[in-house]
């Protein structure tokens, strides 16, 4: 007999393990722990560990001042980002994500490599009267509009058109 120890990553809020005498649901309490499975027959061992890759907002400690009021989007172990080519905003600085947004996983291809992108709606600020060359100016708020945006896995960025990339997004808290 052999003890097989499988690590359940900290991001795994739920899942299922089956095989070698184990058959149980995993919960958030299992995240960041090891599962100990006693394997009696190594020749016929078949263990399946399925982890649910839920989409989540991740925030940094407030001591990381550059990210206060912002969040990154993660799915399982993957961090997602946005590139200029995937939005209608004139700059990624104008994008806000809705805390209650619904993300839709879609199959996507970059440079012949298939991956799962996330599609959602973004809030974009109307800055038509904004002087991007002025260091200071009066605040002129003309509202926000919702538009389609695609997020791709961070590992895949910078393989298409030249432009901006962003991981941390300000959050548009709506009531």
State where each predicted segment sits.
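Short, glycine- and charge-enriched coil/turn segments that flank and shape catalytic ligand pockets
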Residues: 1, 21-25, 113, 117
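Surface-exposed beta-strand/loop patches in extracellular or lumenal glycoproteins
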Residues: 1-9
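Short strand-coil-strand connectors
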Residues: 9, 20-22, 74-76
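Proline-anchored loop/turn motifs at beta-strand termini and strand-loop-strand connectors
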Residues: 9-12, 52
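Solvent-exposed beta-strand/loop surfaces of large extracellular or lumenal domains
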Residues: 12-38, 57-63
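Surface-exposed, short loops/turns at beta-strand junctions within beta-sandwich domains
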Residues: 41-43
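C-terminal beta-rich recognition modules with glycine/proline-rich loops and embedded aromatic residues
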Residues: 50-175
């Amino acid at each position: 007999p052999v003890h097989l120890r499988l690590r359940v990553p900290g991001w795994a809020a739920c899942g299922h393990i089956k095989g070698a005498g184990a058959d149980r649901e995993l919960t958030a309490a299992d995240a960041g722990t090891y599962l100990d499975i006693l394997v009696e027959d190594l020749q016929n061992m078949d263990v399946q560990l399925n982890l649910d890759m839920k989409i989540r907002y991740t925030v940094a400690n407030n001591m990381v001042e550059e990210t206060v009021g912002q969040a990154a989007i993660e799915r399982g172990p993957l961090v997602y980002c946005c590139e200029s080519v995937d939005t209608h905003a004139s700059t990624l600085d104008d994008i806000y994500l809705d805390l209650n947004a619904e993300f839709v996983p879609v199959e996507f291809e970059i440079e012949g490599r298939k991956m799962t992108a996330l599609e959602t709606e973004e809030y974009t600020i109307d800055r038509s009267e904004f002087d991007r060359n002025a260091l200071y100016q009066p605040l002129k708020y003309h509202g926000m509009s919702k538009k389609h945006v695609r997020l791709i896995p961070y590992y895949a960025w910078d393989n298409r058109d030249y432009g901006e990339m962003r991981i941390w997004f300000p959050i548009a808290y709506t009531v």
